[in-house]
Amino acid sequence: MNRKCCGPGYATPLDAYKNGPREKLLYVVTVQPNLSESHGDYLSTVDVDPDSATYCQIIHRTFTNRTGDELHHSGWNACSSCFNITGDDATKIPKRDKLILPSLNSNNIYVFDVGTNERKPEIWKVIDGKILLDNNVSSPHSTHCLANGNVMISTMGDRNDNAKGDFILFDSQFECVGTWTKGAEKAKCGYDFWYQPKFNVMVASEWGAPKNFKQGFHPDHLANPDEIGRRLNFYKWNEQTLFQTIDLGDEGMTPLEVRFLHDPTECHGYVGCALYSNLYHFWRKEGSDRFEVEKVVDVPAKKVDGWALPEVTGLMGDIIISLDDKYLYFTSWLQGDVRQYDITDRSKPKLTGQVFLGGVVLSDSNVVVTEDKELKKQPDPVFVKGKRLQGGPQMMQLSLDGKRLYITSSLYSPWDKQFYPDMIKSGGHMVCLDVDTENGGMTLNADFFVDFSNEPYGPTVPHEMRYPGGDCTSDIWLDE
């Protein structure tokens, strides 16, 4: 007799929102910008329990002991998509005990064991980047677990670092299964992805050709539409085929972080287009299998003197949606602010909060704003616990209850070196915003600051964050 067992995660998004525990640890992808430092990138374990004696401290570092990786994003071997398991053998219930960290530059994929000792993760397996090249993919990015036990990772290039959007699959023991996409139709570029089995759909976004973005930001890389992201790609989930591509145009260049709503019965989502800081809403009309898009937020560029370019765009780095699907947040890495929007009306986000955390247009910088459609004066530098915030807000992670928003400062180390050399010298940071979930609004927590300036082998820069039990960007729920 078959029965349903409870796997990892939570039954529903609202179950996680209402009943999930307060986070006590954060796993933070940490990049060593000094490429000659032999310990390389690492996974930081950060204590975020306010009752702990080591609150706001990095309590463990798990080094790759390799150079040239550029760890970037991370994902789990199992999540809430595996919550409902049918069967009699409880030993076969998936466990959320492995954290996967792909490397953008080397193509190596690190699998960390976080189940044996969640405070001291260890590297369990290293998947050699040559395996990806053998499958004609490179620059692995986003990781999601699948309900069948496999793990899927998006890729952005072919074996020669030309633009190519695809996905590579691994089984539960992290043996390569091959690429996911079937048929001759492939996306021009790749980056992030999110799936919704109820609607038989997966959406994927685009950055650009690895051979280009690895060099840093260069405006001439925007000229070839086949080498720069500007499209949303929709796949039939069961058939594993690309069936619709929507070109967002110049305003939609570099659509990066893409999210469906957490509620698996709502076929709505958003994508943050980094270059010109535009937020797009996408949805499928009832009775149709085709998706539509609309631009719902447009952050205006600031005209400036004293900078490398005549305008400073926001550079929308990350977007995140609260588990109750009420609020959407995004960061503007160059303009330096974090924004909160009420998305109860999916087509008309309402700005409900804004906090500045650095950026390139600060009042004491050499950059002079000559035209600003939003602000009357340039924002002042921000200090937390006596330390000036270098760089700008980039990656985010939201607590399950939506009340704490954690933010790191690094985008991608070649770009960090280009836009924020002082952050490379002094190290990055992590801060926290306290969120009003009832009325909207955010305030900087003056007591929370994680400093990456005095690390054992020199200053480092933090990027993506995860909680041990799952979070607002790792878990996908099924309608069961």
Which residues does each predicted region cover?
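Surface-exposed loop and turn segments in beta-propeller and other repeat-based domains
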Residues: 57-78, 124-136, 180-188, 242-252, ...
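Structural signature of eukaryotic scaffold interfaces centered on beta-propeller domains
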Residues: 2-22, 70-95, 136-148, 194-200, ...
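Short loop/turn segments immediately following beta-strands, especially the blade-tip
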Residues: 45-54, 111-121, 173-174, 234-241, ...
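Short, conserved, GDST-rich strand-edge loop motifs in beta-rich repeat architectures
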Residues: 15-21, 28-38, 84-102, 153-163, ...
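Loop/turn-rich, solvent-exposed surfaces of beta-rich toroidal or solenoidal domains
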Residues: 266-285, 309-423
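Beta-propeller domains
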Residues: 2-6, 15-95, 100-128, 162-163, 183-347, ...
